Amino acid sequence: MGEQTEFEPIQLSPLDQAIPPVYIRILLCFSVVNVDRAISQLQTGVSSLLSALPFLSGDVVRYTAPGKTKWLYQLCPPTHQVQATGVLVVKHHQMRCMVDEKRFAPSSTSHIPLSPFAEPARPAPIFRVQANAYIDGITLGFAFHHIAVDATGMGVIISELARHCRSSPPPSLLCPDYERATRQLISNSRATECSGLDHSGDYISCQALSPPAEGSEDASPSIEISTETRTFVFPAARLESLKNACIEMLPTLDQQQRQQNPCLDEPARTKVPWLSTNDVFVALLWVCLTRCRYQEDQNSGLPSDEHTRICMGVNMRSRIQPPLSADYLGNAILSLSFKLNVNVFRRTQVTNESIEGVDSKDIEHKQWLATICRVARNIRRGVNGMDDSYFRSVVSFLEDSSDCRLFDYARCDFCVPSWRHLCVYHADFGEMGRPKSLEVFDVPGDGSFCILPQHYGAAAPWELLLGLLKA
């Protein structure tokens, strides 16, 4: 683990550089019978993983290119001081980590590596693992530098590490040369013609036109970290039923919209033939949280001059031409950000038919269903617009900016990354087996929520981690 790993520096893409210098930090919890043997397998697995992907042992390094006025980032071989600590740290605890057969004892930040913020002016590790060995189990704390890896890439690395922990893993499916070539491909994916899209409202300048003098304070922005989180569980079957009900209602809403607003522009009149479960789930959350934030007057409804804005991650790997590999580790997620008037979130009247003899609860149920459907339809339209042209437009904007730009999360009332697709709970680590639970650290800001990875097994519920500021 202490060997120096060499690789050629990898230049990061504009999408990597539009990410703040923070770490994605999570904790995986395992119930283990033979802890010593599991730790030995883990050490071998980490060493094998770094041999296959040596850049994971490196650092994110900031620099300025000749003739350029803005900071750039690249992945470089580790410094001697950083490498001496090793990528994997093992800490032994002479106590139990499990409260009962299913629940683990509360953890703390001492169980995960690194701090949430990387120091931009200094080389910062790309990847670190901390193994906490207990009498009855192991918890693995991971830290991934977000400039180098997005959440999808994080899931790929965890699955790959699990594969290397099992005895005699097959040849690696991941290739360092592909990582380098793909980041260059993204950098070259400029728009061939003017798209007419303005991204300036979504990104903010993160520094002065020239780097600060040596020894001066860094100008990079910080992110407020929430001090409280709450986890909510939603049955998968209930969400599937809600999605199907919304899809059935789409033609009715489309017809009603055309009748009430015959002069709508083309994007607003575009039919949405289907909705994903994620669309409907985010719509449900957006409706509930917006109505909690705004007071509704009995006569006038919600305030007509207020808007609520959401941003949600859209994985662009399969949406661009040529498509990127699903196993690409770098940042390939763009934030979809748009706002709606808060009156969109009131109960929607969906029919003019007589309601005589109809139960009032059924009427109210249908009206709220229509509201959720209407919001989900707006979300799906936004996601559908995230295509190859949009991707190239964003890359061009970031490349042409005279200074570094970061996506402006502060403009959003709600921020929704979805990790549902990550196969973390499916990762078999050999002696450790599959993770029993997962904890996410550093959920930023009030109104930020994360849709957690799907548990192993059929009909796994949807889990939501909601970030709240203390009152």
Swiss-Prot record:
Superkingdom assignment: Eukaryota
Disulfide bonds: none
Keyword Transferase: yes
Gene3D superfamilies: Chloramphenicol acetyltransferase-like domain
Protein keywords: Acyltransferase, Transferase
Induction conditions: Expression is regulated by the secondary metabolite regulator cclA.
EC identifiers of the protein: 2.3.1.-
Subunit organization: Monomer.
Function: O-acetyltransferase; part of the gene cluster that mediates the biosynthesis of astellolides, drimane-type sesquiterpene esters that show antimicrobial, anti-inflammatory, and anti-tumor activities. The first step in astellolide biosynthesis is performed by the sesquiterpene cyclase astC that catalyzes the formation of drimanyl pyrophosphate from farnesyl pyrophosphate. Drimanyl pyrophosphate is then dephosphorylated by the sesquiterpene phosphatase astI to produce drimanyl monophosphate which is further dephosphorylated to drim-8-ene-11-ol by atsK.
Protein name listed in UniProt: O-acetyltransferase astG
Native source organism of the sequence: Aspergillus oryzae (strain ATCC 42149 / RIB 40)
